[in-house]
């Protein structure tokens, strides 16, 4: 029994070595055409890729339509020049309204393989692409369809026979050596089993086996070359597609193919606005969302208050600055005139009278002294004293007048615009009341309440209700609790237009926790029927394949793909849920 | 089971081997110092020097294929602009053409060939 198994194993091994020989020795590559997919209801098409573009060519009714998209984003390219090397010479395709490029091509109706050379120039990028179009023979396709409508078992048998047929094809077409090798190995296996059953001459058999293996194996290795230009094996017939008579005009409809991938023709992709992104692995900080509010920058805003109670009057221009008026630091915005109480008025009148009286007396004394000092009857010092006294009295009198006339000026403390104005002519202002608020609209801050301690100097973004986002620079955070949270302040960087003070924003700030993975927009992950999270990978120009993924939340707009797809894949970011609806 | 197992094993091994090798891009250097790529059932080697474009044609076994009867076009990108070069058979397996502008040593582009039987093939050089 054990010997029988040993024999079987050795035969297997032998066959494996001998048959596998050519496969390993095959130093090159297959020259097969790209898999011509899909179902009979889809028109033949060709596609080509470069690192910048994705080109799809669809022949129909003697015309060739090219769809040109960006490779990474799947965005249609408009305004490109497409030049095609046709059998009739170089031709230029004309752009149509729906961002496709049309080329009249009567030669494309001829069945067979058309190899096109397409030069694409879009902006400053030039690319040469090779497109292979395989136009099937309508007559040849007919008999295949005649035996249509196979049962599931037939289907399976057909699939199996296709695989075997492929092997046979490969073997027959390849070269006799390979066939002979296979046959010899098989016979050898039989021989080994037969001999082993007799349990005789095992060493002899082993010797023979080694000898034959070496001989045949060397022969196989000697064929050090590759498989060329074999037509790709036909796809196993598709049951659904087989029901469609091939004579019917092929309509390109988005459909789920039997292998689970989704075929979406380019025009439909544009209708659905499918966009992709290239996945890149990276390290991301987990972010938290905080409620925030726009506040003015404390160093670029100010309030204008009256220090005394009084009557508000307009500045020299005659009008109060309105809301939104631009003011500069030092501009006079208003006056506040102190009212004078009745008792003060009588007091001042009294003082005024006294001073006027004294001034009169001193003036006369100065006159008299001036005359007498010339004769020497009065000393010069006496005249000087009298003159100083007069000056002093006049100053006091003038100051008394000024106190009654001069109001307090309210001036702008900073450059900015008037954000609040409470000035009305004739109004009585109370001391400390705010008359104006001045804010520099280009310098705004955001104050958020954080429940976590944020990393210092950690930049953040703020999202507005309309979807816009602002870049924020960390300024500082408080140490005292407010509503069981810590106030954190950020300065808004860049454009602040459209913001107003007090506006609510959502602040997205990073935390210390770092995660590795691929960041994708939240919209690219959809939930499949069985509840699994999936993303759609853009595998070829018009094919999308669902990939189950494990995602972890990253921030408000993105998720992190921890497992399921690798870097360098094109993943649908826009329109994934529409793609998921394709049946 | 006793009789079946060995044969089943043999058969399984045979099937396992039948899985074909996967297709892949070819890039290499040819005997004439140019880059080699696939073009349908041929291999083409592109040698660009100054304004001259030479394309050497080989087959499955890297044996030269007589170029007589072939037609070809090469489109090569020079300084971001495509240069179209018509190729005509020269001696042996060589097709040759002249570009309007001098070429860089390894230009990006593609070569299209039309065989005497009317079939076309193209190869891309990145």
Model features per residue range: what roles?
Chain B
Residues 2, 10, 14-126:
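Intrinsically disordered, low-complexity terminal tails/loops enriched in metal-binding residues
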């Amino acid at each position: 029994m054990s010997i029988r198994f040993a024999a079987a194993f050795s035969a297997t091994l032998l066959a494996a070595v001998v048959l596998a020989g050519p496969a390993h020795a095959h130093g090159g590559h297959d020259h097969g055409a790209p898999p011509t997919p899909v179902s009979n209801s889809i028109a033949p098409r060709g596609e080509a890729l470069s690192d910048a573009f994705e080109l799809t060519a669809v022949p129909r009714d003697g015309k060739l339509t090219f769809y040109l998209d960006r490779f990474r984003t799947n965005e249609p390219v408009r305004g490109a020049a497409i030049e095609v090397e046709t059998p009739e010479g170089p031709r230029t395709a004309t752009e149509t309204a729906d961002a496709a490029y049309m080329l009249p091509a009567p030669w494309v109706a001829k069945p067979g393989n058309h190899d096109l050379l397409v030069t694409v120039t879009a902006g400053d990028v030039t690319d040469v692409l090779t497109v292979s179009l395989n136009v099937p023979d309508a007559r040849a396709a007919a008999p295949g369809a005649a035996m249509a409508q196979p049962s599931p078992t037939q289907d399976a048998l057909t699939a199996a026979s296709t695989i075997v047929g492929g092997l046979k094809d490969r073997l027959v077409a390849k070269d006799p050596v390979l066939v002979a090798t296979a046959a010899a190995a098989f016979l050898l296996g039989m021989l080994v089993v037969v001999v082993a059953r007799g349990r005789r001459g095992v060493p002899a058999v082993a010797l023979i086996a080694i000898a034959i293996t070496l001989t045949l194996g060397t022969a196989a290795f000697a064929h050090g070359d590759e498989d060329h230009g074999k037509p790709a094996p036909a796809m196993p017939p598709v049951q659904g597609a087989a029901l469609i008579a091939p004579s019917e005009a092929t309509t390109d409809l988005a459909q789920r193919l039997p292998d689970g991938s989704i075929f979406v023709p380019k025009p439909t992709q544009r209708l659905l606005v499918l966009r992709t992104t290239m996945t890149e692995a990276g390290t991301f900080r987990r972010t938290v969302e905080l409620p925030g509010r726009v506040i003015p920058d404390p160093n670029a805003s100010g309030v204008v208050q009256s220090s005394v109670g009084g009557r508000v009057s307009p500045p020299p221009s005659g009008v109060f600055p309105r809301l939104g008026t631009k003011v500069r630091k030092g501009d006079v915005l208003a006056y506040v005139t102190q009212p004078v109480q009745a008792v003060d008025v009588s007091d001042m009148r009294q003082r005024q009278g006294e001073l006027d009286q004294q001034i009169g007396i001193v003036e006369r004394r100065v006159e008299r002294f001036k005359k007498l000092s010339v004769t020497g009857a009065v000393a010069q010092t006496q005249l000087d004293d009298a003159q100083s006294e007069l000056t002093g009295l006049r100053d006091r009198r003038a100051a008394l007048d000024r106190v009654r006339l001069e109001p307090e000026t309210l001036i702008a403390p900073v450059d900015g615009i008037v954000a609040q104005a409470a000035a009305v002519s004739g109004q009585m202002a109370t001391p400390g009341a705010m008359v104006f608020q001045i804010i520099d609209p280009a310098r705004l801050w955001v104050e958020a309440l954080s429940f976590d301690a944020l990393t210092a100097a950690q930049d953040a973004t703020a999202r507005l209700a309309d979807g816009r986002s602002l870049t924020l620079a960390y300024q500082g955070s408080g140490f005292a609790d407010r509503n069981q949270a810590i106030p954190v302040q950020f300065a808004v960087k860049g454009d602040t237009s459209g913001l107003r003070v007090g506006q609510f924003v959502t602040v997205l700030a990073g935390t210390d926790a770092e995660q590795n993975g691929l960041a994708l927009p939240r919209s690219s992950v959809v939930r499949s029927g069985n509840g699994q999270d999936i993303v759609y990978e853009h595998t070829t120009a018009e094919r999308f394949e669902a990939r189950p993924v494990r995602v972890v939340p990253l921030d408000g707009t993105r998720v992190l793909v921890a497992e399921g797809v690798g870097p360098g894949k094109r993943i649908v970011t826009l329109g994934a849920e529409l793609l998921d609806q394709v049946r | 089971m006793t009789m079946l197992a060995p044969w089943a094993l043999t058969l399984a091994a045979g099937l396992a081997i039948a899985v074909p090798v996967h297709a892949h891009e070819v890039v290499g250097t040819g005997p004439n110092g140019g880059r080699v790529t696939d073009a349908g059932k041929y291999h083409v080697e592109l040698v660009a020097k100054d304004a001259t474009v030479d394309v050497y044609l080989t087959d499955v076994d890297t044996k030269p294929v007589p170029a007589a009867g072939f037609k070809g076009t090469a489109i090569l990108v020079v300084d971001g602009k495509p240069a179209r070069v018509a190729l005509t058979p020269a001696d042996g397996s060589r097709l040759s053409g002249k570009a309007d502008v001098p070429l860089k040593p390894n230009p990006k582009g593609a070569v299209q060939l039309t065989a005497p039987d009317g079939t076309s093939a193209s190869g891309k050089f990145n």
